[in-house]
Amino acid sequence: MAERDQLEVDVLFVGAGPASLAGAIRLRQLAEEHKRDVSVMVIEKGGEIGNHGISGAVLDPRAIKELLPDWLERGAPVESPVTSDALWFMSEHGKIKAPIVPPMMNNSGKYVASLQKLAKWMGEQAEAAGADVFASFPGQELLWDDDRVIGVRVGDKGIDHEGKPKSNFEPGPDLLAKIVVLGEGPRGTLAKQAIAKLKLDEGKDPMVYAVGIKEIWQCPPGTVKAGSVIHTLGYPSGGTFGGGFIYGMAGDLLDIGFVVGLDYADPTTDPHYLFQRFKAHPAIAPMLKDAKLLRYGAKAIPEGGLYAMPRPFADGLLITGDSAGFLNGMRLKGVHLAMKSGMLAAETASAALGADAYEENGLALYEENFKRSWAFDELHTARNFHQGFDGGTIACLLYTSDAADDLTR
């Protein structure tokens, strides 16, 4: 059997999403500032950077402006600034448009963006900054020295459906790193290994998840207003946590999706069926008339909030983005928080490299800096959003409106 190669790197980011790519860019910026030779690698399981990002999101630019103040001048691929906001309360046969958009759903100054295009562009920015970015490198398991993470084993190639080597078998390399930063998205393979082994969720609330289902439709020319944003509550989710969204993108593309909390009480609840009913609603169906479905997908969404976030550091390890629960369910946004978490992880890694100290006592700076950041303030404000739905939609809106007032004071 072929030998397994070993590669050494200072900092290894796993998963080429907004968190890891922002972290890689920030770490290379700090290396240049301090005139240090810091090797940074990002690995991604998808065949291309951005493959796992389903198009369509409302991007809060706060974090990316901090990271790259000239991000738009560099050609960041946004579809459109948000041009209109609406909140619809849905019944089975009709809708009521809210007279005002609640503060937490106000998207003035935000951008409708394609996550797929944005991740690809950020990967290019990371490479230009000096990081190595590799697609088709799935992290299979963490490498350990007792309870310290020392690297990642990449998945083997050339194996059959039973996991047995074929004639073209090629063992995945072992990537050894002083610090491993996990940004795999929700319930990431390696993050689950680390959280379970090191009990990083001990003393935390259980993480609660939702499933977000999304489709991209090509609509007839002139029928989609780029930058339009609509969120919905009510039908067809009933008393279940969730709601819909419709984002207008450039080129008459329509991003339509539905979120359903996976803690639903009715065991017969079918999120995909609810999404089909949502699209058939008389307020939604006309938008899809003569349209063609281009892409579809679904992902888990960590909705547990601040008190369900695991401890995001250990010996040789940092956890970022959705893997660590950096998502604001109240605003239905996580990209900016993922970026900020990656930047905070990069700043922690830079300090650790400077001190040649990679144990958890040194990497605890990550959590300390998070608690001093605007990201913590935002997540603290939204800490009970999901639980608020237990009292019904109206009670939750009253809570979130009050919480949003706190955030904007």
Language model region names:
Residues 46-92:
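N-terminal FAD cofactor-binding segment of flavoenzymes
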Residues 105-124, 265-269:
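Short beta-strand to alpha-helix junction loop
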Residues 30-52:
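Glycine-rich FAD pyrophosphate-binding loop
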Residues 11-36:
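N-terminal Rossmann-like FAD-binding beta1-loop-alpha1 element of flavoenzymes
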Residues 399-408:
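Single conserved hydrophobic/aromatic residue that forms the stacking wall/gate
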Residues 347-391:
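Active-site-proximal substrate-binding core of FAD-dependent oxidoreductases
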Residues 300-320, 325:
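FAD-binding beta-loop-beta segment adjacent to the flavin cofactor pocket
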Residues 128-283:
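Predominantly flavin-linked oxidoreductase catalytic cores and closely associated redox partners
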